[in-house]
Amino acid sequence: TCNTINAWCNENTDGLIPEIMKPDMLNENSELCLTNSLYFESGWSQDPWDVSDEKEKFGDNEETKYMTSIGDNYYENDAATAFEKYYANNLSFIGILPKAEGDFTLDELDIEGLLESEPEYDEVNCKMPKLNFETTAELSDILSRIGLENVFSDDADFSGIADKAVHVSSVLQKTKLELDENGTKAAAVTAVTMECMSAMDTDPIIKDVELTRPFAFLIYDSANEEVLFMGKVLTVQ
């Protein structure tokens, strides 16, 4: 069963996420494992990135090589500045730099308000490191806190998809993202395991957004106003 789930995961993310389940994650009470995936791959639309040969500082204690380019849009609110750069398929990457240095939460950035801002500008210069990372998160506690307690309890009702009385025992999500001067690959797989119930003429306005310290990012579908991927980058190691 575990090998079957992982084979599906590998196939549906084009090998970007070859595995999500370990054998010890399933037991004799495991009845169902529901999985879904999201896969994204695209090159950049225009204005390619230039890659530096020299390393520069990221934050206070790290160094990395940076890419620079001209962005397509600029956003700003009281909490952050951001650049948007288009992919070749009507989606875009949005790099968000908090105005306050140090750690931050995504809620503090008011991303919805940020994307609705219309600051005055003529051009935006953008700078960021290449990205290559993978994260794994167990989402059960988060989902319970936002109101989905019943699916984890004996009150859960999955009679439409299961013959036995079952409840959700775990919700595991793995995400992988690779971004460089050529484009972006990103994938996410979520596995929900269920158990049987027993347990004007003026000078041009040039804006700069340099992601040289912890920042946030979106892969955004502006046509449908949907965020496909969202994350924070706190380290480049």
Regions found by a protein language model. Name each.
Residues T1-K99, S117-T202:
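Non-catalytic, conformational "gating/processing" segments within enzyme and secreted inhibitor domains
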Residues L16, G102-D103, V227:
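Short beta-strands and strand-coil junctions in structured, solvent-facing domains, enriched
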Residues L34, T81-I96, D201-Q237:
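Extended hydrophobic
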Residues T105-E108:
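Gram-negative host-targeted secretion-system effectors, predominantly Type III and Type IV
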